[in-house]
């Protein structure tokens, strides 16, 4: 084997330093990689875009230039490897930057570019729908927020990101418990029948009790693995759902673990 085979490439070392939290050394190495990359006859444009993205996120460039740098990375990856995991990640990072800059509509537009039609992986599509749902919820546009959170829950469940799927289920349930109607279409039916809208609105929809049950089961299965902790919003939501749709078995499942519960709010509710 050649020396090239036995020595790990600098980009791999860069990744290792990042994962170990050694930011200073990673940034030093990244400057060397970018310098060498510019001098190579065959530049690795994908690695270059990835490293520039990481540098922007780590604060290695002026804050005023971060947005432009992240946009450059998205455009470069879109031209050389559209639909790749790295392209999807670059879009997520750009959307996050827009959201943090209070540019919510730009964040939503950017997140919409992550899709199965574009060839992005299921887990990144799920994460993008979760972010879209959160932004729409913040705006108060709850009908599409609920659809996005539901799609995110389904996508992340199917890609074995169970912790993230639970987060989606919780955020969906928190909205859904405000308005329940047995005659309401299920979320799957709403997603199938969804049509593009000309402009955002402040819409709300009632939820179907069957969807409430599905989301609670996802949350409960995870929550019962360990019920300790001082702030257990997941268990609190389940108790709310148990009362609102009159499903005592969920409360009973939590009551069986009462001695392990530490959240004072839950202890008070369970004593009432």
Q: Where does each model-flagged region fall?
A:
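TPR/TPR-like (Sel1-like) alpha-helical repeat modules
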Residues: 146-157, 173, 184-201, 212-221, ...
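Amphipathic alpha-helical segments of tetratricopeptide repeats
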Residues: 31-38, 71-79, 112-119, 150-158, ...
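Structural signature of alpha-solenoid helical repeat junctions
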Residues: 5, 42-47, 86, 124, ...
